[in-house]
Amino acid sequence: MSKQPRTAPGRATRQRIVQAATELVAERGVAATSLDDVRERAHASKSQLYLYFSDRDDLMRAVSESTCDAVMEVQSESLAAFDSLEGIERYLDATVALQEQRDARGGCPIGSLVGQVAEHDEGARLALADGFDRWEAGLRAGLEAMVQRCELRADTDPALLARQILASLQGGLLLTQVRRDSGQLRAAADGVLALIRAQRTA
């Protein structure tokens, strides 16, 4: 289990190690990222690495947590506005635009980690599941607000709709990555809008 440092310099060192590992995993994948690679990128000693992380799996759990935090931070502003049709359209447009900026490479950082760590490390799987839970909760909160304002039908299930939206986006992100075509995500986004419009009161 990773150790949380008590001093500011210790916290900075641990964060530098996690950031280096997160960058390397995004660039090369988990299998191609060694602890020596991380130490070199982070300018950290072996003793510093093992002071905060018991082994490689422990570090990858921290990478999973860090990745989820970063994904939520990037979309925090647009997700907070996911409570009107206009806000939802802006959120979806921003999500597609980000993939266009990345030339349809990388996919969803959380989703990309799932296949690499979830089947052999329960701690990492739980960290990634928590990231998706937080994402889904943000979507659900906006939909609940729309139901309360009678912008969506009273029989709308915000929890189910949020799950459908997240699943659609993840599928779109995966197809965008493998086909190198952001139009895949745009098709998923259009499907999300159709789902929401079907629940509108007017």
Predicted feature residues:
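Helix-turn-helix
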Residues: 16, 20-58, 62
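Hydrophobic alpha-helical connector segments
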Residues: 62, 76-107, 158-165
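Short, basic, alpha-helical segments at the C-terminal edge of helix-turn-helix-like DNA-binding modules
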Residues: 65-71
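Amphipathic alpha-helical segments used for helix-helix packing
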Residues: 87, 102-123
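Hydrophobic alpha-helical segments that form the core
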Residues: 111, 138, 156-175, 191-194
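Hydrophobic alpha-helical bundle segments that form small-molecule/ligand-binding pockets
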Residues: 120-126, 133-161, 198-202
